[in-house]
Amino acid sequence: MTEQAQNPSSSEKRAVILLSGGLDSATVVAMARAEGYRCYTMSFDYGQRHRAELHAAERVARDLGVVEHKVIGLNLNGIGGSALTDSTIEVPEAPGEGIPVTYVPARNTVFLSLALGWAEVLHARDIFIGVNAVDYSGYPDCRPEFVEAFERMANLATKAGVEGQGFRIQAPLQNLSKAEIIQAGVRLGVDYGLTVSCYQADDSGHACGKCDSCRLRAEGFKAAGISDPTPYF
């Protein structure tokens, strides 16, 4: 019998954690581990501009000692509609008004749905996601209302939820600034040199230093008073 098919003991806590390979999700893995969870991480090869973040996710998962790291293949560039999945749309190098073109339609809904499925198989009741509503790019699926609504849906749409074994969607970074996230991660031993945040990093993980994600990351390290380990072009 595989570990996935076994019910955990009453004292064992399991969590599925969405791990992009970036700063925020790496911090969330460390937080869950510190809370005593056996951590199962999930990343997605969804047709994004580069694979550097997937390599980063593997490094982070290994460094933080997760139980299992799973990479799911999707083809969101078949849908397009985002600068991250459509090479004909340029990644902006300055903040704009409204929801930016780097928003990927329904991405967190899709990712959380697959994490929910794995959590049900694992008999895990907690799903962690590194969304943030303070220092963020304005994506609608990073807001607290979205997280709360998805949790309600998860408990309506699953066998476990119907049988009273409810799921919790945990977003521990929701109300933290980027500086606070970095400070928390450093306290928990996160090696941010392993992570990649840039929307258009090269294959080696070197960052452009110009996109919104790079800007938020650099400002966060500066505000935290911590040296930024990010390699740039």
Curated annotation (Swiss-Prot):
Membrane-spanning intervals of the chain: none
Residues annotated as binding ATP: L19, S20, G21, G22, L23, D24, S25, A26, T27, V28, V29
Pathway involvement of the protein, from the record: Purine metabolism; 7-cyano-7-deazaguanine biosynthesis
Superkingdom of the organism of origin: Bacteria
A GO biological-process term: queuosine biosynthetic process
Cofactor note: Binds 1 zinc ion per subunit.
Ranges in coiled-coil conformation: none
GO molecular function terms noted in the UniProt entry: ATP binding; ligase activity, forming carbon-nitrogen bonds; zinc ion binding
EC number, UniProt record: 6.3.4.20
Stored SUPFAM superfamilies: Adenine nucleotide alpha hydrolases-like
InterPro entries, A to Z: QueC (IPR018317), Rossmann-like_a/b/a_fold (IPR014729)
Class of the enzyme per the UniProt entry, highest EC level: ligase
Any one Pfam family match given in the protein's UniProt record, by short name: QueC
Keywords, alphabetical: ATP-binding, Ligase, Metal-binding, Nucleotide-binding, Queuosine biosynthesis, Zinc
Recorded catalytic activity of this chain's protein: 7-carboxy-7-deazaguanine + NH4(+) + ATP = 7-cyano-7-deazaguanine + ADP + phosphate + H2O + H(+)
Cysteine disulfide links: none
Function statement: Catalyzes the ATP-dependent conversion of 7-carboxy-7-deazaguanine (CDG) to 7-cyano-7-deazaguanine (preQ(0)).
Cited NCBIfam families: 7-cyano-7-deazaguanine synthase QueC
Family label: Belongs to the QueC family.
PANTHER family for the chain: 7-CYANO-7-DEAZAGUANINE SYNTHASE
Protein name: 7-cyano-7-deazaguanine synthase 1
Protein's organism: Pseudomonas fluorescens (strain ATCC BAA-477 / NRRL B-23932 / Pf-5)
Native organism taxonomy: Bacteria, Pseudomonadati, Pseudomonadota, Gammaproteobacteria, Pseudomonadales
Gene, per the UniProt record: queC1
